[in-house]
Amino acid sequence: MLAPKKQKFRKAHKGRVASKAKAGTMLAFGSFGLKSIDGWRVTARQIEAGRKAATRCMKRQGRLWIRIFPDVPVSKKPAEVRMGKGKGSPEFFAVRVSPGKIMFEIEGVEENIALRALELASAKLPVRTRIVRRYE
């Protein structure tokens, strides 16, 4: 699973998702991509589930790029613990995905396979997405 090797700080603020993505809105590597419509927090597990679904559909052909990286530590308190007594310990990593951000890109497979792979990947993600082509 994706996680940063080093961190400057152990815990992060909850934060908010930015209004619209400023960078990473155009296809850079592949011919087909998965673009977010909503802004939401995507966890490392969800990214990995999407990657597995897409590569399984592509039958290990072509190439898949993941354009997002989970770098925000999300903390959580244990179940049935009273309020207060500090912030919980870091539980998992997530990335804040803004609307318009390209999340996955595919190259080197037929169009119908690429579209199916991106559909399967989008089903694993908590954001609404749309599939974009290079020349659209």
Curated annotation (Swiss-Prot):
Pfam families recorded: Ribosomal_L16
A GO MF label: tRNA binding
CDD domains in alphabetical order: Ribosomal_L16_L10e
Subunit: Part of the 50S ribosomal subunit.
Zinc-finger listed as a keyword: no
Name of the gene: rplP
Transmembrane feature ranges: none
Family indicated by similarity: Belongs to the universal ribosomal protein uL16 family.
Single GO cellular component term: cytosolic large ribosomal subunit
A single GO BP: translation
Keywords carried by this UniProt record: Ribonucleoprotein, Ribosomal protein, RNA-binding, rRNA-binding, tRNA-binding
Protein name: Large ribosomal subunit protein uL16
Naturally occurring in which organism (per UniProt): Rickettsia akari (strain Hartford)
Described purpose of this protein according to its UniProt entry: Binds 23S rRNA and is also seen to make contacts with the A and possibly P site tRNAs.
Domain of life: Bacteria
